[in-house]
Amino acid sequence: MKPFADLFQTADWKNEKHSPAIEVPERVKKGEDFQVKVTVGKEIPHPNTTEHHISWIEVYFLPQGGRFPFQIGRFEFTAHGESTEGPNTSTVYTKPEVVLFFRTEKPGTIYAFSYCNIHGLWANQIELGVE
């Protein structure tokens, strides 16, 4: 049996359409809200069809020296063109891109996870500096 952590795939988001791209300032001010943007398919668009799509993105923050991460957001994408008339008939599609805000007083690591219904779990991370 594989450990759950081994199910996550990683790759440079500039070359892989499944890897979540995380955009944050290099440094943020202690205790002030800042923006985090996570996109799947930023450089290479990911298909968004009934048959092949991104189902969700989760974002976590692990403060430096912390033992456990904090979940700071979970976002589900539920419109992939399906309707009562069949697959890819509704013309309604959600884009796997989210923007959220949070604040911290400690530097740490932001983690983003995404799930493709065909290619499984994907992960990325970025360091966050605090001044």
Annotated model-derived regions:
Residues 39-50:
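Short amphipathic, basic-aromatic surface patches that mediate peripheral association
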Residues 1-29:
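Short, compositionally biased P/S/T/A/G/V-rich stretches that sit at domain boundaries
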Residues 88-99:
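Aromatic sugar-binding surface patches on proteins
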Residues 98-106:
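Short, hydrophobic beta-strand segments
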Residues 33, 105-111:
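Extracellular Ig-like/FN3 beta-sandwich strand-entry sites
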Residues 115-125:
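Short acidic/polar inter-strand loop motif in beta-rich domains
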Residues 70-87:
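Solvent-exposed serine/threonine-rich low-complexity stretches and specific carbohydrate-binding patches
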Residues 49-57:
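Short coil-to-beta strand junction motifs in C2/discoidin
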